[in-house]
Structures are given as structure tokens and as C-alpha cells.
Amino acid sequence: MKIMIACGLVAAALFTLTSGQSLAADAPFEGRKKCSSCHKAQAQSWKDTAHAKAMESLKPNVKKEAKQKAKLDPAKDYTQDKDCVGCHVDGFGQKGGYTIESPKPMLTGVGCESCHGPGRNFRGDHRKSGQAFEKSGKKTPRKDLAKKGQDFHFEERCSACHLNYEGSPWKGAKAPYTPFTPEVDAKYTFKFDEMVKEVKAMHEHYKLEGVFEGEPKFKFHDEFQASAKPAKKGK
């Protein structure tokens, strides 16, 4: 997938979104180490994605042609640019999120919390739900996690980076805008329903055990589960 690595993020736009939005906006980020302690297989496959390597493109003399097309300076270190960093890390400008002054490896790259929401408020309940299912088969309503800020839909979070340009069809777009637009290069055209299925962008999908039930459920949940790999429990 020709991922658009976007400069010009208004970082707050990422986290005032969808169900559980007010709680998610206030929740601290924790970093993907917490998520990957259980979701090891997903975390391992994520490491090979463009999202995992998002910060690399901000380094000097990397993606030189793309930067020149967008009228950026290829020799500049954009890892220090507050208008760029937010679309290449988790939680920039948010509680517990990535900072330029003290960058944390577990928040570097577009990881778990950029899509699923900042985890502090829901992670404990998420883990307890898994434990309850293993013990007694008890299922947990997804709405309980959504109320705590877990995002089951993702589209707005993706749009906040991939569609944040002048003239964007996304209504949330606002300055500072990304310079990487479809007008600069057609590869920056972003259609969520297509891109979310791009295997080079996302971690592998594995069979879920059925811990959660009900709405809100991601619109491609059943489709992804139909072709998901066998679960790698405890790996």
C-alpha cells in the first residue's frame, strides 16, 4: 500500500471522535507495550507495516522525491516538527502521548492506540473481559468498552491524517493541513473502505474467541474474521 504519511496534523482532531469520544479525549495513552503483552501475534505482524515505520519518512533525506513533490525540504529533520509528528506517532499532544522532547519507543509509529483509542480507561476492563471468558465463557458487551473509550470503528481516526488537506471531502479537515494530497500525487487518494483492507498497512487478523458481543461492531468485522488466521494464543 502506498501509505500517505501526512504532515500538518492538528493532533487533537484524532481524539474527539466516535463512540466514547469524550472519555477517549481525556484518557491517557499507555503505549503499545501494554496491548502487545496479550496481543503478541498482532503486535509482531504490525512491525512490518508502513504504520510501524511511519517516523522513518520524517528523517532527513528519506522519501526525498515525495517531499520534493509536496514542496518540503528533503534535507530537513521533520521528526522535530510539531506539525508533522502527530501523524507518525501515538498520542502527540495528548495525555501520556508521544513528545518531541522525550520520545518513547512504545509510542513511536502509528500503533494500537492511534486506531483503537487511548487505552488507560478501557484496557483493564478489556483484559478482565478476556479472563472472565476463559473462566466461565461469559461474554462482554462491546458497548461497555466503547463507554470507556475503546474505538470499534476507526474511520474518523484514519481520516484525521489521511484526509486532512484543503478541499478534503472529510468535514473535519482544518489547518495546519497535510501537503500530501491527491493533487500532488494520486497515490494519496484515501478511501477508507479500500485502504482498511490493505494487508501491507494493517496487522494480521487472527480468529477471535468471542469475548465481546453486540454493537458497536466494526463494519468489516465479520468479513475479516472469515479470512482470519488461526489464533496464536499466548504467542
Curated annotation (Swiss-Prot):
Heme 1 binds at residues 35, 38-39, 126. It comes from the Bacteria. Residues 1-24 form the signal peptide. Residues 121-144 are annotated as: Disordered. It is found in: Periplasm. The keyword Electron transport applies. It holds the Pfam family Cytochrome_C554. Heme 4 binds at residues 51, 158, 161-162. Heme 2 binds at residues 84, 87-88. Binds 4 heme groups per subunit. Keywords: Electron transport, Heme, Iron, Metal-binding, Periplasm, Signal, Transport. Disulfide bonds: none annotated. GO terms for cellular component: periplasmic space. Gene3D superfamilies: Flavocytochrome C3, Chain A. Heme 3 binds at residues 112, 115-116, 203. One of its GO terms (molecular function) is metal ion binding. Involved in ammonia oxidation; accepts electrons directly from hydroxylamine oxidoreductase (HAO). This is Cytochrome c-554.
